[in-house]
């Protein structure tokens, strides 16, 4: 996509990352400059979700914060998801903390948003890890659905 890292093209301090086309971390000429980003944001705006999970690889971490903003129950929900999956709960730092889908969702809607960094090891993750990664992240997704339904 023209050297734009879609992970940093969302309107949430997207300009804080790399400022020219690059294999990674370039946020684009402007927020939502890429059709993939616009497709996601238009869909989310239309559907008005209560919570958002953005899955990336890798790190076995759950991020819940954007620029000091969190949804009302974000920390508590992140801890529950971490308990289910054995992932760590983290606040992103550096360029990882800007321009992402979760960041935009928190900024735009003030609701719980999470980035789940799946698996560890090489990138991309090998197919041999599929069952393990699926099991861990199915638990995270089920926990999130439970929180949306009952809280």
Please state what every model-predicted region is.
Residues 44, 82, 105-106, 145:
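N-terminal cationic-hydrophobic initiation segments that often serve targeting/anchoring roles
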Residues 93-113:
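Short glycine-rich, acidic/polar surface loops and turns
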Residues 26, 30, 63-64, 87, ...:
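Sequence-level detector for tyrosine residue identity
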Residues 1-75, 79, 84, 115-129:
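Active-site/substrate-binding loop(s) of hydrolase catalytic cores
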Residues 86-93:
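Short secondary-structure junctions
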Residues 125-151:
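His/Asp/Glu-rich mid-to-C-terminal helical/loop segments that flank catalytic regions of hydrolases
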Residues 47-50, 87, 146-151:
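Surface-exposed helix-capping loop/turn segments at secondary-structure junctions
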């Amino acid at each position: 996509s023209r050297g734009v890292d879609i992970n940093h093209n969302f309107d949430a301090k997207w300009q804080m990352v790399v400022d020219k086309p690059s294999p990674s971390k370039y946020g684009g000429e402007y927020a939502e400059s890429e059709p993939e980003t616009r497709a996601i944001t238009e869909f989310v705006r239309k559907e008005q979700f209560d919570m958002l999970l953005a899955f990336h690889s890798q790190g076995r971490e759950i991020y819940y914060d954007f620029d000091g903003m969190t949804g009302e129950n974000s920390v508590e929900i992140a801890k529950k998801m971490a308990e289910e999956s054995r992932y760590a709960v983290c606040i992103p730092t550096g360029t990882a903390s800007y321009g992402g889908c979760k960041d935009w969702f928190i900024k735009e809607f003030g609701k719980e948003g999470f980035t789940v960094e799946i698996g560890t090891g090489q990138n991309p993750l090998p197919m041999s890890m599929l069952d393990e990664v699926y099991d861990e992240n199915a638990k995270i997704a089920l926990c999130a659905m439970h929180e949306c339904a009952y809280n």
